[in-house]
């Protein structure tokens, strides 16, 4: 697979995560997910994640931590995915692609986790990234600036 799937769990200063809603044609359904997209050859995974966060949400982050790498569906494709945790956010104007109609919301991290548990967030990279961050929180693996922000 030529692109590498990337996702970002952006955490703001109040412990909210930014989610993106959009219609996904392959499933003929609306989907809530973390900001994500494809990283083309020639750019690093981190550069692609930074670009997607900026384009979809108008957000840049000072700090980044890779939290999960995965095979997205190894019985059907060789596409790989990587997700990052991003914090120390700055906000600007979103720059979605012409064919993207996105709805961007902020919810407490715990609410995003509940949406995963209820099956409202179904995208595999989003589910894996949110659950990984929750596990890091439960196991005391979050970096100091995030410990008080991410509540599970």
Model regions and ranges:
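Conserved hydrophobic "DFG−1" position in protein kinase catalytic cores
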Residues: 10, 19, 85-86, 106
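The catalytic Nudix box helix
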Residues: 34-66, 84, 96-98, 108
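Conserved Nudix-box catalytic region and its N-terminal flanking loop in Nudix hydrolases
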Residues: 1-2, 7-51, 55
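Nudix hydrolase/Nudix homology domain
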Residues: 30, 75-76, 82, 99-152
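Active-site segment of metal-dependent pyrophosphate-handling enzymes
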Residues: 12, 24, 54, 58-92
């Amino acid at each position: 697979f030529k692109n590498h799937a990337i996702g970002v769990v952006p955490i703001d200063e109040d412990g909210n995560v930014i989610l993106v809603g959009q219609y996904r044609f392959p499933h003929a359904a609306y989907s809530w997910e973390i900001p994500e997209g494809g990283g083309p050859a020639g750019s690093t995974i981190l550069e692609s994640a930074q670009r997607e966060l900026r384009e979809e949400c108008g957000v840049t982050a000072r700090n980044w931590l890779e939290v999960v790498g995965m095979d997205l569906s190894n019985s059907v494709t060789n596409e790989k995915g990587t997700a990052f945790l991003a914090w120390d956010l700055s906000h600007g104007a979103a720059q979605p692609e012409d064919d993207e109609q996105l709805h961007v919301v902020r919810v407490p991290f715990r609410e995003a986790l509940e949406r995963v548990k209820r099956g409202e967030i179904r995208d595999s990279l989003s589910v894996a990234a949110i659950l990984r961050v929750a596990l890091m929180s439960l196991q005391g693996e979050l970096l100091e600036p995030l410990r008080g922000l991410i509540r599970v």
